């Protein structure tokens, strides 16, 4: 935990953060956190607008963009954190051990959140969001330290092509031919072989949406973030040319993703190569737009609202996972039976006024605001909780 260096005490200005920070990155990360909380905590999971749900299998909704946005921004953050230290190889050992420690902490937090809801070690889910972020962060840090950008570009291409070949041309050891069917593809088989069904996502049972094999292409998402971060961090380049280059990268990535989708479908659970390109392109465009508005044109008056989340992203994530459980431990009588605290709020406050879908989303918005106010206390005190 550390105090942020302050240039002003006014919370309406992003000058409270260190000047070396990319303000648009804090904003964009915070916006992603807000979106994540919104889609993860509907008032009623049975009444949700389609864009606020994950795709059933192939395809990509706005909700499917949240996770790759996080990994993409991990890549950008790696550049901003390590670019000045990378040249001195004596620093590498310390950086690697620090990255390893962070990976282990993230894995520990992810497992602890699961045990908070379901204290059953016999069915402890090993894969998870924070677990993947930790592993991808560590491996991407190693790649960034030990390679140049040209090598990383080639590695990204190798990852995307090799993953396509593995899933589409290697037979599944249990006897199935190469396929992309949820329960029968190679990635699902690997998860069952490594974790067993007792330690995977209990709602899918035979495969895990954050599985082991699909972590390989997830590294590609972070490498895209490193590529964009290197361009943003580079000094001495006209910012208009820099933004134009990034927009071109973003559009090209989206187009390549859509072309690849024709033979390797965009799929979040498999984290297909087309999904890496498509989601990475959208994130590139979004971050570039934020960079141009906030860091170039200096329209920063209201950016702090989302930076509250962005600066303390891990804290916001953990709270958004734990607080609903605490609220739902409270059972409230309703129409002859008891309902959870979150569901009660939805039924009593919003459902009598709005349609079920609107009541569900308004309930989620209130929860976003609740978590925001908790994190705002840290922001106000200039406290950043780091791992």
Question: Which stretches of residues belong to each language-model region?
Answer:
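Alpha-helical transmembrane segments and their immediate juxtamembrane cytosolic regions
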Residues: 2-387
């Amino acid at each position: 935990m550390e105090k942020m260096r302050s240039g002003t005490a006014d919370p309406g200005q992003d000058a409270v953060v260190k000047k070396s920070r990319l303000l648009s990155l804090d904003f964009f990360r915070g916006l992603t956190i807000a979106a994540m909380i919104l889609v993860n905590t509907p008032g009623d999971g049975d009444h949700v607008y389609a864009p606020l749900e994950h795709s059933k299998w192939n395809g990509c909704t706005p909700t499917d963009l949240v996770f790759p946005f996080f990994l993409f921004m991990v890549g950008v953050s790696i550049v901003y954190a390590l670019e000045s230290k990378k040249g001195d190889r004596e620093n590498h050992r310390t950086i690697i051990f620090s990255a390893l420690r962070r990976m282990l902490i993230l894995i520990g937090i992810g497992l602890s959140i699961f045990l908070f809801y379901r204290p059953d070690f016999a069915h402890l889910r090993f894969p998870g969001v924070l677990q993947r972020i930790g592993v991808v962060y560590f491996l991407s840090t190693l790649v960034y330290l030990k390679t140049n950008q040209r090598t990383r570009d080639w590695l990204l291409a190798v990852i995307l092509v090799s993953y396509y070949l593995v899933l589409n041309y290697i037979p599944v050891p249990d006897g199935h031919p190469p396929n992309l069917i949820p329960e029968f593809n190679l990635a699902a088989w690997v998860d069952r072989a490594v974790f067993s069904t007792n330690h995977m996502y209990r709602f899918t049972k035979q495969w895990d949406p954050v599985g082991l094999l699909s972590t390989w292409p997830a590294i590609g998402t972070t490498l895209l973030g490193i590529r964009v971060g290197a361009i943003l961090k580079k000094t001495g380049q006209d910012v208009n040319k820099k933004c134009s280059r990034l927009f071109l990268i973003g559009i090209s990535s989206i187009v390549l993703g859509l072309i690849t989708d024709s033979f390797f479908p965009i799929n979040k659970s498999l984290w297909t190569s087309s999904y890496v390109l498509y989601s990475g392109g959208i994130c590139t465009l979004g971050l570039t737009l934020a960079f141009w508005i906030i860091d170039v044109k200096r329209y920063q008056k209201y950016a702090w609202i989302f930076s509250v989340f962005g600066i303390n992203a891990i804290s916001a994530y953990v709270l958004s996972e734990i607080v609903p459980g605490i609220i739902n431990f409270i059972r409230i009588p309703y129409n002859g039976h008891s309902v959870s605290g979150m569901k009660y709020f939805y039924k009593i406050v919003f459902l009598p006024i709005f349609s079920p879908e609107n009541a569900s989303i308004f309930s989620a918005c209130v929860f976003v605001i609740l978590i925001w106010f908790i994190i705002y206390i840290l922001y106000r005190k200039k406290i950043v909780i780091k791992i």
